[in-house]
Regions:
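Short, conserved active-site loop motifs that form the nucleotide-linked donor/cofactor pocket
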Residues: 81, 107-108
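Structural microenvironment flanking redox-active thiols in thiol-disulfide oxidoreductases
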Residues: 65-102, 113-119
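C-terminal motif of bacterial Sec signal peptides marking the signal peptidase cleavage site
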Residues: 12-14
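Sec-dependent signal peptide recognition
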Residues: 2-8
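N-terminal "domain-start" segment that seeds a small globular fold
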Residues: 16-44
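Hydrophobic beta-strand anchors of alpha/beta hydrolase catalytic cores
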Residues: 52-53, 83, 129
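Thiol/disulfide oxidoreductase modules built on the thioredoxin-like
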Residues: 101-105, 113-156
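Short active-site neighborhood of thiol/selenol oxidoreductases, capturing the structured segment around
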Residues: 43-64
Length: 162
């Protein structure tokens, strides 16, 4: 019984850890195939040096939980145009209802229609947040970001936003 509990505790601990995935590059062609959630217009973020991309869905309770932290990040100096939320396996209509209900801050809401960017970025599920520098995923937060994660992002990555 103790071994089962220890195994379960280790599994839960591993699953809740932030994971660094170095070497995953997002193809430029994938980043220029995204559409805005509100108008459906094509948007090209392939030239951005620094991005914070959050994968989310309107039906995801943890996405609702972390949303205020992402809004706060989007209002932080240097991050104003760097925070993107990609709707993952969700309808545009539900995404717009989510924004209407929970607010938007300075976040850029996008649709990954075929989940192509999510798949090639190694997304496990929602919510998941990636810190991207020059197309490379340099940090992954799997699960909802917390206040501590928000502070870590601001403290560790604000110098990259220049």
């Amino acid at each position: 019984m103790k071994i089962k509990l220890l195994t379960l505790a280790l599994f839960i601990s591993f699953c809740s850890q932030n994971i660094v995935d170095e070497g995953i590059f997002i193809e430029t062609s994938d980043l220029n195939s995204l559409k805005t959630l509100d108008t459906g217009e094509n948007i090209d973020i392939s030239e951005a040096d620094f991005l914070v991309i959050n994968y989310w869905a309107s039906w995801c309770l943890e996405c609702i939980e972390e949303h205020p932290y992402l809004i706060e990040l989007s209002k932080t100096k240097g991050f104003e145009n760097a925070v993107y939320m990609l709707s993952f396996q969700d309808s545009r209509e539900n995404g717009l209802k989510f924004i209407s209900e929970y607010g938007s801050g300075n976040i850029n809401y996008l649709v990954d229609e075929n989940s192509k960017v999510a798949i090639y970025s190694g997304v496990f599920g929602v919510p998941e947040t990636h810190i991207i520098k020059n197309g490379e995923v340099i940090k992954k937060y799997i699960g909802p970001i917390s206040l501590n994660d928000l502070q870590e992002i601001i403290n560790n990555y604000s110098h990259l936003t220049n």
